[in-house]
């Protein structure tokens, strides 16, 4: 089984063009790729013909003697030189073709909504009881139109997570962090740090109970590897590079876990392989200059637990459903109300064929905010990383499918807890499911997080 994009290129280039149109990408790239592939196949035929000629000639030489033998040896040398030149030409064309094809985004799944940006994303599910300030009811109903949602109206306006963190609880300081490190960094203290750790422990406890192998991966990857996992040309402003080193800081454990089988083959009967990666995540957020400047929703570093699956092509959609189900279970246990959104074609990102986002309702902001991103990357990453499965019983090889989903991104989930679990007096209730991870530590909060009288710094 060959790479899906290459198959489309050969069998149905017009369909490949339609796919690019759904992402608003220049379709002339397909025409260039078709020409390169046609040229590659022509040169391949020449190479195979020359190889056959050389093999025939080589088999004749041992049977000859004298001048005729010398003549054939010379002829063989000349033919070998021509063959080597043709093989180099073939390799050059193949590299050029594959580089062009690798620059293309993944094929979009049929049931992905068409549209150039996130305004075309379609909510497909709502869960939980939504806490809505009386002045925001109209806006809430606009965002949940045509959905049968359960909500309660509250008469007091919840405070935003940034205000709660710094001015009410006095358990965070982004101003001092900005002074010594720049914007989008933070200091967190005491109960919020315990909350961060409890979220991570809860997520890895739950996900590993679903049969996932826990992994602590490298926090940096070489350029060749990160380029294979993501579209680095597009995301170069989002990824940190180590100065004077061929190393990049990962933006999620997905990157390192995906590369675990870089340039390797996996026995088909070992699939699926399921992992839960835990790591810090480092992001420049260069494209979000004026978004979420306050608080800890959009930051340069945070802790994250990531689900990742290597699958056979025929099973990948089943596992995509499993990943989002796991994520939903985590947020249901946290009792954070959310919606699931089917992401539009123009908002997908190059890697994904289809993506669901889980967005939690933030009552202070009166909007849904992304907490989880769940993608089926089909064979897009696997082709670039040269990760194949081997079916020895049927003598077949093919590219694996890779899938990923957030389990928990700690700081974002903390913002959701601060907005959804706050009381009017500023006290924040600790979600019940997290309490068993805190009770073993004498200094950790148990049931509630109380405001400090004075700031720590």
UniProtKB/Swiss-Prot annotation:
GO terms for cellular component: cytoplasm. Its main location: cytoplasm. GO terms for biological process: selenocysteine biosynthetic process; seryl-tRNA aminoacylation. ATP binds at residues 283-285, 299, 370-373. GO terms for molecular function: ATP binding; serine-tRNA ligase activity. L-serine binds at residues 252-254, 306, 406. Its EC number is 6.1.1.11. Keywords: Aminoacyl-tRNA synthetase, ATP-binding, Cytoplasm, Ligase, Nucleotide-binding, Protein biosynthesis. It is found in: Cytoplasm. Belongs to the class-II aminoacyl-tRNA synthetase family. Type-1 seryl-tRNA synthetase subfamily. Catalyzes the attachment of serine to tRNA(Ser). Is also able to aminoacylate tRNA(Sec) with serine, to form the misacylated tRNA L-seryl-tRNA(Sec), which will be further converted into selenocysteinyl-tRNA(Sec). Consists of two distinct domains, a catalytic core and a N-terminal extension that is involved in tRNA binding. This is Serine--tRNA ligase. It comes from Saccharolobus islandicus (strain M.14.25 / Kamchatka #1) (Sulfolobus islandicus). The lineage of its organism: Archaea, Thermoproteota, Thermoprotei, Sulfolobales, Sulfolobaceae. The gene is serS.
């Amino acid at each position: 089984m060959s790479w899906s994009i290459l198959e489309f290129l050969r069998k149905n280039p017009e369909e490949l063009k339609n796919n690019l149109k759904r992402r608003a990408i220049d379709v002339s790239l397909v025409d260039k790729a078709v020409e390169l592939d046609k040229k590659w196949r022509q040169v391949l035929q020449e190479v195979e013909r020359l190889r056959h000629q050389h093999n025939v000639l080589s088999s004749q030489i041992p049977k000859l003697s004298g001048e005729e033998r010398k003549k054939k040896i010379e002829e063989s040398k000349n033919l070998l030189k021509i063959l080597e030149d043709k093989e180099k030409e073939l390799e050059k064309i193949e590299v050029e073709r594959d580089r062009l094809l690798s620059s293309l985004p993944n094929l979009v799944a049929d049931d992905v909504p068409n549209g150039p940006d996130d305004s075309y994303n379609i909510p497909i599910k709502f869960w939980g009881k939504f806490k809505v300030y009386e002045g925001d009811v109209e806006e809430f109903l606009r965002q949940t139109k045509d959905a049968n949602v359960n909500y309660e109206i509250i008469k007091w306006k919840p405070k935003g997570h940034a205000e709660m963190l710094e001015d009410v609880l006095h358990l965070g300081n982004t101003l001092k962090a900005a002074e010594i490190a720049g914007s989008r960094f933070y200091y967190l203290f005491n109960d919020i740090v315990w909350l961060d750790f409890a979220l991570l422990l809860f997520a890895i406890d739950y996900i590993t109970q679903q049969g996932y192998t826990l992994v602590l991966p490298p926090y940096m990857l070489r350029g060749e590897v990160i380029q294979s996992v993501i579209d680095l040309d597009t995301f170069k402003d989002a990824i940190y590079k180590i100065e004077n080193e061929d190393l990049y800081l990962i933006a999620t454990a997905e990157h390192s876990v995906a590369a675990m089988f870089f340039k390797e083959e996996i026995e088909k009967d070992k699939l699926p392989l399921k992992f839960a990666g835990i790591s810090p995540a480092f992001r420049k957020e260069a494209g979000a200059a004026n978004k979420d400047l306050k608080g800890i929703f959009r930051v340069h570093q945070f802790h994250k637990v990531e689900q990742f699956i290597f699958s056979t092509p025929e099973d990948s959609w089943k596992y995509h459903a499993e990943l989002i189900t796991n994520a939903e279970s985590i947020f249901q246990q946290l009792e954070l109300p959310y919606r699931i959104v089917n992401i539009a074609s123009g908002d997908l990102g190059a890697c994904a064929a289809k993506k669901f986002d889980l967005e939690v309702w933030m009552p202070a902001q009166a909007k849904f905010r992304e907490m989880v991103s769940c993608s089926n990357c089909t064979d897009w990453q696997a082709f670039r990383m040269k990760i194949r499965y081997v079916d020895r019983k049927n003598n077949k090889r093919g590219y694996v499918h890779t899938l990923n989903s957030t389990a928990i991104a700690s700081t974002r989930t903390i913002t959701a807890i601060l907005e959804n679990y706050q009381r009017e007096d500023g006290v924040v209730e600790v979600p019940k499911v997290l309490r068993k991870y805190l009770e073993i530590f004498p200094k950790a909060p148990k049931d509630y997080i109380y405001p400090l009288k004075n700031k720590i710094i």
